[in-house]
Amino acid sequence: ITPKMSSDKYYLWDYYKSNRHPQTKKILRKKEKFMRNISDQDTILIPCTAELYRMKETDSLLIWKRTLLNDVCPVNAIVANDGSSIATFDNWYSTGYGVNVFVVYDETGNAKKTYKLEEISPFPLNDYMMSISSLHWNNAERYIDNGKIEIVFVTENNRQITRIYNTKNLAFEK
């Protein structure tokens, strides 16, 4: 997995381009000077991507390369042993928040299902340990076979519930 990348100048370029900055003479002069010296490379934002390889003897064969739904980069990613599905968890800098807390991709790298934490959590969101940027909700995730993912939810008080997700049905088991 390769995280989202940008040049050092990208966000300042984006800020100046948006005209959300104060319209003072001093700032407008800075903007004009900055914009004269910016290159096309400075304005490119490269999204988070993933590559899946199959190992064959001593060689590796690229199966697919895709852009992931995560804004910056998933915190964790797991792959079924047969490559039939891939799951990503959370977003870097914002664990537990957003629409891509849990994403299931198929064997070709296409997103099949996305979840917010409130859609999958067996606990109220207030039960999880919180920091300024994140909700710390899971203790572990792993494939228990090629079609099932075990996810361990853990609260701030160390209560745990393990849920099994079926990647074929795209649903949690009861």
What are these regions (language model features)?
Residues 1-174:
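Secretory-pathway ectodomains
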